[in-house]
Amino acid sequence: MSVREKMLEILEGIDIRFKEPLHSYSYTKVGGEADYLVFPRNRFELARLVKFANQENIPWMVLGNASNIIVRDGGIRGFVILCDKLNNVSVDGYTIEAEAGANLIETTRIALRHSLTGFEFACGIPGSVGGAVFMNAGAYGGEIAHILQSCKVLTKDGEIETLSAKDLAFGYRHSAIQESGAVVLSVKFALAPGTHQVIKQEMDRLTHLRELKQPLEYPSCGSVFKRPVGHFAGQLISEAGLKGYRIGGVEVSEKHAGFMINVADGTAKDYEDLIQSVIEKVKEHSGITLEREVRILGESK
């Protein structure tokens, strides 16, 4: 029995797509094919999938919402798992529990509907709840570490564990999940009671700021670089005269130099080449070495 036949038999009922182009699922609109793109409907299907992959020595990874990711043009080998069907969100008192595939922005709106404060900072951050925990996403002085109560994960060995914020060892755009290989299943956020109108005003203010400053009208991978201590990446790039600097179909945004936008059918290679060139030119200009925030995955073509 071939691996494909075994896969279809053992993983019967799970949505598996073979040789699926990933550019359709990426915010950058670039990326080659996944060998197997999988859409589990619940944690049990996810556990079955991970168990099968481990038994058959097939590599696997969770892509999240692909909002702060560049998938290389050669694609990704093995299983690529999209958890957007694991998207239930519930409210219990001042606590919100969200599955990993829940949309982060929509989760902040649920907090608003229940007059819960603490989540406003994330009201414009694209991506999934699981990806936000993985990266310790943050903006405007807030971050996931400030509100996370606990997190349920599937370990790389297929076991389910509950982790505290301390266990996750949060840092700037970092969590312990990045090293552990675990998959976020669900998250509990501890919020506080607030006033609906006040929360809405703050979310509207932050949304307006984001729309004003960020090139949301183009495909992009969000913030490309981490914030250097004592500086802003976008400012350093701008001071190096790189606004509008372009390689292939990808350019440094004129609106916000911390963003690289896909303006003309750019490729992942265009993104990588532009990122490397910007790092070198900023280093020459200011002596500061920028560090990537965006993750680059897969194989070159």
From Swiss-Prot:
It catalyses: UDP-N-acetyl-alpha-D-muramate + NADP(+) = UDP-N-acetyl-3-O-(1-carboxyvinyl)-alpha-D-glucosamine + NADPH + H(+). It comes from the Bacteria. The active site is at R173, S223 (proton donor), E293. Its EC number is 1.3.1.98. Its main location: cytoplasm. Pathway: Cell wall biogenesis; peptidoglycan biosynthesis. GO terms for cellular component: cytosol. Pfam families: FAD_binding_4, MurB_C. It is found in: Cytoplasm. Its cofactor is FAD. GO terms for biological process: cell division; cell wall organization; peptidoglycan biosynthetic process; regulation of cell shape. Residues 30-194 form the FAD-binding PCMH-type domain. Keywords: Cell cycle, Cell division, Cell shape, Cell wall biogenesis/degradation, Cytoplasm, FAD, Flavoprotein, NADP, Oxidoreductase, Peptidoglycan synthesis. GO terms for molecular function: FAD binding; UDP-N-acetylmuramate dehydrogenase activity. Cell wall formation. Belongs to the MurB family. PANTHER family: UDP-N-ACETYLENOLPYRUVOYLGLUCOSAMINE REDUCTASE. This is UDP-N-acetylenolpyruvoylglucosamine reductase. It comes from Streptococcus pneumoniae (strain JJA). The gene is murB.
